[in-house]
Amino acid sequence: MAGITGVMNMKLAARPSSGRHSRGCRPAVVPSAGKQMLLVRRHPPGSASWPTRATGGGGGGVPAGATAADSSGQAKEEEEEDRASRNTSSFEPSIWGDFFLTYSSPLATSSAQKARMVHRAEQLKKQVAKLIAASGACSLYHRIHLVDALERLCLDYLFEDEINDMVTQIHNVDVSGCDLQTVAMWFYLLRNHGYRVSSDVVFAKFRDEQGGFAANNPRDLLNLYNAACLRTHGETILDEAASFTSKCLKSLAPYTYMEASLASEIKRALEIPLPRSVRIYGAKSRIAEYGNQTEANELVLELAKLNYNLVQLQHQEELKIITRWWNDLELQTRLSFARDRVVECYFWMVGVYFEPSYSRARVILSKVLAIVSLLDDTYDVYGTSQECELFTKCIESWDPAATGGRLPGNMKFIFAKILDTCQSFEDELAPDEKYRMHYLKTFIIDLVRAYNEEVKWREQGYVPATVEEHLQVSARSGGCHLLSCTSFVGMGDVADQEAFEWVRGVPKIVKALCIILRLSDDLKSYEREKMSSHVASTMESCMKEHQVPLEVARVKIQETIDETWKDFNEEWLNLNTNSHLPRELLERIFNLTRTMVYIYQQDDAYTNCHVIKDTINSLFVEPVSIT
């Protein structure tokens, strides 16, 4: 679609022209007003009861001489008086409530039990490290398959140096005499690790005169399909491979005649291709599938199970921290118009980094996402146009005294909580890390400016004339700029000031992330949102720009998403080969993109959180059976 290149050159905090408001679409991170919740409160599998969140909130906030009930009642009375003149939301209460405050895993019955798990995992790590070292004498296919298995099982972070050495060796292998399955896996592995390998050179010999490929079985098709999803602009052979393999894989349905694990892989890949999937969300399924493979290694399998359970215990402790923080803010007792989704926020951000070493970064990022969600609902549901304008100016000032008597009590309350939360981040950072907060605040301010623009659009019923104009603001209001920056804030020394300056400039890979998310969200949500009052989406701008009906606009938007993925892949390769940024940082951006794809592939699983309830339960509650 023409015009998107202009968006790729947008700058942070570039204010839209005041004469014609440049679109302020709902953030991609969270949905807009008018979205109807399909949520049903359900008990988790295997539990006898399900806790609801206590209405009294966490500690603090009760004046001397008053009871928690008095404070809660007063807040409720003030809210009810205010609510009559405002929009209302239909968001359901949290599914999870305080569940993780009291949940005790069957794996954590004693410190001795956990110590035994850790000890056994350390033994297995040493044995698997020897296995990796010995694989250098094995076939290329065997080495690729081993690395692929370790990555799918979320074990690669335990063997980072060993895997990097092996990938370097694999890169130097001549694959001209290999079969399609091996070549496709080789290409996928190297592209995924940031190596710019030629597609024409390795895949040309597998093409036929009809434009197809010499794929002899479903596994060949699947591997070629995954490889093709890492294509960049101008790679015609991979465009053809993607089209060919997609059609062939779909034609194989219902897959009843093939191995169950392969059938599951194909179904998942057609929903979300492997390079765009969130590994930790599907790790438990892949552990089970790996265990059913004839070439599975028992040491790798046992380590995968133990490591999954140990990581799960770490995540459970962090969920206690997150839930307690959310309760202590007392947001759910005063702000009934907003979504209570703190567990879903944490689930989302675990996809950005699941590894135990990123605990501080993960907790900070989850809290910021919860704040983003609250801000979105404040602009989208609660505030009037005038109030949102004042609220934006208050946040721009970053001064608690700026609220004066002009803002509603709830907006003052929210502003104070944002300041308190950011101060807590700063207190947690080391002296030589505190500069990071400047970048975080800058992106929060830019986000609320974009939110404020969308309020103006909604009030005016304005539809941007082009998709490019729309994205000048809606790509910013998606929150991905802020989350990209925040993903660095809690990391270690690897995130230096050069990295923050890089992300402050909103590099092309982050812009591509923002566009992919905005368009994917609008593509999924248009039919639902048009039934209620909402901010114009990119779908409407596309129809207006090209004077086409809805179905044609859908095709154009999908084409733009596909082309933007090529931009993303190109930048992934450029940054891995031509920049000084550590891959550890670049992975945060790629993983953030993957989580966005997952959430919006599910038709906004953040708001419609029943969609991911079972996945959350599987990831954070149910351990993997070791036997």
UniProtKB/Swiss-Prot annotation:
Its EC number is 4.2.3.111, 4.2.3.-, 4.2.3.113, 4.2.3.15. Binds 3 Mg(2+) or Mn(2+) ions per subunit. Induction: Induced by wounding in roots and leaves sheaths. One of its GO terms (biological process) is terpenoid biosynthetic process. Gene3D superfamilies: Farnesyl Diphosphate Synthase, Terpene synthase, N-terminal domain. Pathway: Secondary metabolite biosynthesis; terpenoid biosynthesis. Its cofactor is Mg(2+); Mn(2+). Expressed in seedling leaf sheaths and roots. It is an enzyme of class 4 (lyase). (2E)-geranyl diphosphate binds at R339, D376, D380, R518, D521. It catalyses: (2E)-geranyl diphosphate + H2O = (S)-alpha-terpineol + diphosphate; (2E)-geranyl diphosphate = (4S)-limonene + diphosphate; (2E)-geranyl diphosphate = gamma-terpinene + diphosphate; (2E)-geranyl diphosphate = beta-myrcene + diphosphate. Residues 1-53 form a transit peptide. InterPro entries: Isoprenoid_synthase_dom_sf, Terpene_cyclase-like_1_C, Terpene_cyclase_plant_C1, Terpene_synth_N, Terpene_synth_N_sf, Terpene_synthase-like, Terpene_synthase_metal-bd, Terpenoid_cyclase/PrenylTrfase. Signal peptide: none annotated. Mg(2+) 1 binds at D376, D380. Mg(2+) 2 binds at D376, D380. A motif (DDXXD motif) lies at residues 376-380. GO terms for cellular component: chloroplast. Monomer. Component of the volatile terpenes biosynthesis pathways. Mediates the synthesis of a blend of monoterpenes. Converts mainly geranyl diphosphate to alpha-terpineol. Also triggers the biosynthesis of minor monoterpenes including limonene, gamma-terpinene, beta-myrcene, terpinolene and 4-terpineol. Belongs to the terpene synthase family. Tpsb subfamily. This is Alpha-terpineol synthase, chloroplastic. It comes from Zea mays. The lineage of its organism: Eukaryota, Viridiplantae, Streptophyta, Embryophyta, Tracheophyta.
